[in-house]
């Protein structure tokens, strides 16, 4: 077992910076050495389907016409085949593509023949929004590593979508490049003419290049998807199935430099007991993107505005665990794949830790105090890329500023660093990698009693495919260490991630400790291709493993074993276009072997010929003996009772003007004493080709007979009362989005989510014999009023976003967000009409933001 107890994790901000700067400084030198090596040879098993790019002496005019000289000489790519719904079928209409290039750009002209051009579906939307529209997509593997690539897609209305592909099939939909495309609908069908600057993609330095390439076409009205070369859904991966693009000679290797300065004006009003608090702020910042080499890019940002366009979803968390929130900030979203560790992009690096809400705001007692929702990011930089040898590199460094209210620190200045490297072998079929994260906080005496001062985590991961890509092995070994005062480490030991103080845990709880270390082991084996797939995995998290300073970890002290099997019918049959069935078995234990969870699951999915979908999932929890080690929130483990669940999702044909969907779930447990049912209808209405409205509703009724209520007394003492109650909870929320697109460069989006949940606690009990076989013997009555613990929580989040790309890469955003909260009326009483009326009458907080950026390309 890997131990970190003797590792000195202490490091200062200066040392952190030096580590990152050293990496940034040395990698390009190594890159030049590696780039001089020959490109990786492909194995004989790789498809030889290829196309040749024609050199262009004069750049074509990007207008969607094929009257430029290059299109007269370039060889046409033909032979597109259907891959969905039928694999290797004959296409309804022909498709052709021609490819040219010069030292600065790739040029691609595509002709989508259609016998009925007046029936071509062409919908206008914001950039990167997928609609039920015709589409042509160009996928380019410029490293020719069969694992990564860039995707450029457009529909007949000229709406652009672009992605970065990694791990052979995963997509980073947030990647945005600056490129041109023009489309036209004519008597033969429609066309798309692309200009893709080589500065926007990455490739090794060489006299002659071979890129991987695939072109796909969607014909929505016939529910058909075609590709060249043929993409086989029965095989694992996408980039590994690309054809070859040859003939690329003399490509430039520019040291790309892009600068995007911006100005932001922000006005905030927040309700206070004595009125409204108002603040206005103007800031200036900028983003920089520099091509250190042809395949390494440095991104930097100074004084960034990292506002979220949509608010996080409203919810009331009654569990012991932190809520995971999705990242929506472009700087951190782009390049996510490089920082993924063994397929998990969050356990070691959860980017929302950077700029998080102040952690010590609860120390401020003044109700009129202005407490910011986020911590300012003073600056951030990252270096990412992939070398000719198959080495992927990613480093990130960020500094957030100190936040204080008066003399009370609510968030310290913090330095963050992430270093990730991985090496591919066997043309990407195998690989090993390593990752290290570092956090350092500048704490005063009060904050040092609550927050950890230093944190380091790291690990190695590996993957290996064999049997012509049908089978895979993967694994990782990680370790962590955190340091701080005895007070801060004691809080760490007692939080829900660890619960060292649980009386029957048998863990070495020590309130005088000033550090904790731990390890993580993961092993996986899978059959990943073919009609039948299956696999198994084992993971162990030691009690002291801790990554939450820069990662996301809900629970340590856990072993998980799981197995699954799946059968997929990818060819159309009499009753469906495609269908699948999966079975799962999962068992969890503490690190010391106490069984905590087991569940068995069956999932069924069908897509019918009319494009309707139906999925049904059913699972049973804790049919075998298990003990919940988190239910008593630091108390003893409680015998878990079985529950049975069913989830149904029904989706309509996505092509009509009105598209309804429905999801419903039902749960019964605690021998019928606990029930939950939830229904979520959703409808999308597209009244015009550029106007859509989405409305969703969620209603939930939860009767939980074993809801944790509280612990009275010192946790772990003989006199502690571990209290549980019956919770009767109702929840109602609405989600609405309105999208209007005036042009491909100008759009308006409105978002609103009113949220209401109420709950009453009754039948209060305390643990008596928590591991008793009989449910009735585990608890005994406890006499204490519960009325004060009832709740009525109401929230409203709205946002209006106007986005105008007034020139390529340059945008103006106008954003208005509003929030309303109310929790002090009608506790325990559920009356939606009354409650939403009260909510809309509550005083709002408002934020109006205007941001303008200007993209400069050198």
Task: Identify the residue ranges that each predicted region occupies.
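Structural preference for beta-rich elements and adjacent junctions enriched in aromatics
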Residues: 32-424, 429-434, 842-845
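N-terminal secretory signal peptides that target proteins for export/translocation
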Residues: 1-13
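Alpha-helix capping and helix-loop boundary segments enriched in small/acidic/polar residues
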Residues: 275-276, 287, 319, 371, ...
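Bacterial N-terminal signal peptides
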Residues: 15-28
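Short acidic, glycine/serine/threonine-rich loops at helix termini
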Residues: 225-227, 311-314, 405-407, 444-448, ...
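Exposed, low-structure sequence patches enriched in small/polar residues
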Residues: 376, 472-474, 478-858
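Short coil turns and loop connectors of transmembrane beta-barrels in diderm outer membranes
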Residues: 58, 104, 114, 146, ...
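Surface-exposed extracellular loop regions of Gram-negative outer-membrane beta-barrel proteins
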Residues: 252-299, 416-507, 574, 579-584, ...
């Amino acid at each position: 077992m890997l131990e970190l107890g003797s590792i000195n994790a202490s490091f200062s901000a200066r040392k952190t910076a030096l580590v990152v700067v050293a990496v940034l400084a040395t990698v390009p030198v190594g890159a030049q050495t590696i780039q001089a090596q020959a490109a990786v040879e492909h194995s004989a098993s790789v498809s030889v389907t290829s196309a040749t790019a024609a050199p262009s002496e004069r750049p074509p005019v990007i207008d969607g016409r094929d009257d430029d000289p290059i299109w007269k000489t370039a060889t046409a790519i033909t032979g597109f085949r259907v891959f969905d719904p039928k694999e290797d079928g004959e296409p309804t209409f022909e498709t052709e593509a021609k490819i040219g290039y010069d030292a600065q750009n790739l040029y691609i002209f595509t002709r989508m023949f259609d016998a009925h051009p007046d029936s071509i579906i062409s919908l206008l939307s914001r950039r990167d929004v997928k609609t039920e529209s015709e589409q042509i997509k160009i996928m380019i593997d410029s490293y020719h590593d069969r694992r990564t690539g860039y995707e450029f897609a457009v529909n007949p209305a000229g709406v652009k979508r672009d992605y970065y592909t990694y791990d052979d099939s995963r997509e980073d939909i947030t990647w945005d490049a600056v490129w041109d495309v023009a489309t036209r609908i004519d008597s033969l069908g429609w066309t798309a003419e692309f200009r893709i600057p080589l500065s926007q993609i990455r490739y090794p330095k060489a006299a002659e290049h071979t890129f991987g390439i695939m072109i796909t076409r969607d014909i929505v009205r016939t529910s058909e998807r075609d590709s060249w070369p043929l993409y086989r859904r029965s095989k694992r991966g996408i980039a590994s199935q690309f054809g070859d693009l040859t003939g690329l000679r003399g490509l430039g290797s520019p040291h790309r430099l892009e600068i995007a300065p911006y100005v932001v004006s922000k006005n905030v009003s927040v309700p206070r007991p004595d009125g409204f608090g108002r603040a206005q702020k103007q800031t200036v910042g900028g983003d920089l993107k520099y091509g250190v080499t042809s395949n390494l890019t440095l991104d930097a940002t100074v004084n960034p505005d990292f506002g979220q366009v949509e608010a996080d979803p409203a919810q009331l968390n009654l569990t012991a665990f932190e809520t995971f929130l999705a990242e929506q900030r472009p700087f951190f979203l782009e390049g996510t794949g490089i920082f993924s560790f063994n397929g998990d992009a969050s356990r070691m690096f959860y980017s929302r830790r950077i700029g998080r809400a102040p952690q010590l705001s609860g120390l401020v007692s003044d109700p009129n105090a202005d407490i910011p929702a986020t911590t300012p990011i003073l600056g951030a930089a990252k270096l990412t890329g992939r070398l000719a040898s198959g080495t992927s590199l990613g480093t990130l460094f960020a500094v957030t500023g100190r936040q204080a209210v008066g003399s009370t620190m609510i968030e310290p200045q913090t330095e963050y660093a992430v270093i990730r490297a991985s090496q591919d072998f066997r043309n990407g079929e195998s690989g090993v990698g390593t990752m290290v994260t570092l956090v350092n906080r500048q704490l005063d005496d009060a904050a040092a009693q609550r927050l950890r001062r230093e944190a380091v985590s790291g690990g190695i991961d590996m993957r290996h495919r064999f049997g012509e890509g049908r089978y895979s092995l993967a694994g990782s070994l990680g370790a962590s260490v955190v340091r701080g005062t005895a007070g801060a480490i004691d809080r760490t030991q007692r939080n829900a991630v660890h619960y060292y103080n649980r009386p029957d845990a048998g863990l070495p709880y020590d309130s005088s400790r000033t550090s904790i270390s731990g390890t993580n082991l993961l092993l996986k084996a899978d059959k990943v291709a073919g009609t039948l797939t299956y696999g198994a995995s084992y993971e162990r998290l030691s009690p002291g493993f801790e990554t939450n300073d820069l990662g996301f970890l809900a629970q340590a002290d856990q072993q998980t074993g799981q197995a699954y099997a799946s059968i997929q019918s990818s060819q159309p049959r009499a009753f469906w276009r495609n269908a699948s069935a999966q079975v799962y078995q999962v068992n969890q234990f503490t690190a010391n072997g106490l069984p905590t969870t087991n569940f068995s699951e069956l999932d069924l999915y069908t897509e019918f010929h009319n494009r309707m979908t139906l999925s049904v999932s059913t699972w049973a929890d804790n049919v075998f003996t298990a003990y919940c080690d988190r239910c008593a929130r630091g108390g003893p483990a409680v015998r878990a009772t079985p529950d049975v669940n069913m989830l149904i999702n029904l989706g309509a044909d996505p092509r009509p003007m009105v598209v309804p969907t429905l999801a419903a779930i039902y749960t019964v447990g605690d021998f019928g004493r606990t029930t939950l049912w939830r229904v979520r209808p959703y409808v999308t209405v597209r009244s015009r080709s550029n106007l859509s409205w989405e409305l969703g509703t969620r209603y939930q009724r939860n009767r939980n007979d074993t809801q944790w209520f509280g612990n009275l007394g010192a946790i772990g003492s003989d006199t502690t009362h571990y209290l549980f109650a019956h919770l009767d909870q109702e929840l109602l929320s609405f989600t609405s989005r309105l999208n209007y697109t005036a042009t491909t460069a100008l759009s308006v989006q409105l978002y609103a989510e009113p949220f209401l949940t109420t709950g009453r606690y009754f039948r209060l009990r305390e643990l008596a014999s928590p591991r008793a076989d009989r449910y009735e013997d585990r608890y005994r009555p406890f006499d204490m009023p519960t009325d004060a613990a009832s709740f009525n929580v109401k929230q409203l989040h709205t946002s209006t976003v106007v986005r105008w790309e007034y020139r390529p890469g340059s945008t103006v955003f106008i954003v208005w967000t509003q929030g309303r909260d109310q929790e002090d009326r009608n506790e325990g009483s559920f009356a939606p009409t009354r409650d939403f009326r009260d909510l809309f009458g509550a005083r709002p907080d408002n934020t109006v933001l205007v941001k303008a950026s200007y993209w400069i390309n050198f």
